[in-house]
Amino acid sequence: MSFYIYPLSFSLHPLRAMYVIMVYDVEQERVAKVCKYLRQSLNWVQNSVFEGELTKAQLAKVKSGLSSIINEEKDSVIIYTMRDVKWMERENMGVNKNPATNIL
């Protein structure tokens, strides 16, 4: 069993960003659309998981776009937000599906 721990940096942009992890479970016919849409704003981590830094305005835009793609009666999207990523540590157990060399 292998473990990977990625220290995550935090940009000091004037419009302070938050760190976002999005996890989704949508019906098969919408998986590709959701994945393609989220790749525009976040980093793909593994099947149905994206992460990255977004401002509040960017997150609102992503959520608005997602609401036009998903069926809220059948699909699920979970959004985790952290105000300060410096207190977060990412650990990967097992296969690392997207070994990023630069994590935002």
Each PLM stretch: what is its role?
Residues 12-20, 68-75:
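Short, surface-exposed loop and linker segments with low hydrophobicity and enrichment for Pro/Ser/Thr
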